[in-house]
């Protein structure tokens, strides 16, 4: 049995290996956005529980009733049961601060010409992209990044740019 984090690390390891990057490091700075009180619930469920049309980008998890925090066992459609923990979560600015730290960690490699592959969930990668571009992290909501797709961030004439997106 593996914990959620161990399973994610195995998935990331396999993804990195398939992309030709066998040597990897875990960057906690690009861990999945902590949805807190919304974790394990659909947007519809959260909206019903909160009494308003909740949106993670606009409202964040801390806008939700603290009564939504706690621990429970969720049963997946496959029948598998997984533990869910809900704390207060983090707002988009806190997630953005983490991604700025990740960028700072990989910049020395980029500055000497190395390629860097970051494997993570779409929301945190969208937020990271906003920080790469130097724009407000809420801009990330406008960047569609589908499951199992990639993007390439690079520099062009001294500016951080998006070279390819949602490929």
Predicted regions, residues:
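GST superfamily/GST-like fold recognition
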Residues: 122-126, 156
């Amino acid at each position: 049995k593996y914990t959620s984090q161990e399973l994610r690390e195995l998935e990331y390891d396999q993804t990195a290996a398939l992309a030709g990057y066998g040597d990897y490091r875990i960057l906690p700075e690009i861990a999945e956005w902590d949805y807190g009180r919304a974790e394990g619930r659909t947007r519809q469920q959260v909206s019903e529980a909160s009494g308003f049309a909740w949106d993670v980008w606009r409202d964040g998890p801390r806008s939700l009733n603290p009564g939504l925090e706690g621990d429970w066992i969720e049963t997946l459609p496959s029948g598998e049961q997984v533990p869910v923990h809900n704390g207060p979560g983090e707002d988009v600015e806190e997630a953005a601060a983490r991604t700025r730290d990740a960028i700072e960690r990989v910049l020395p490699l980029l500055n000497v010409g190395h390629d860097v592959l970051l494997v993570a969930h779409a929301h945190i990668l969208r937020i990271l992209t906003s920080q790469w571009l130097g724009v407000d992290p809420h801009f990330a909501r406008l960047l569609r990044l589908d499951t199992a797709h990639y993007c390439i961030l690079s520099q062009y004439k001294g500016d951080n740019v998006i070279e390819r997106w949602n490929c």
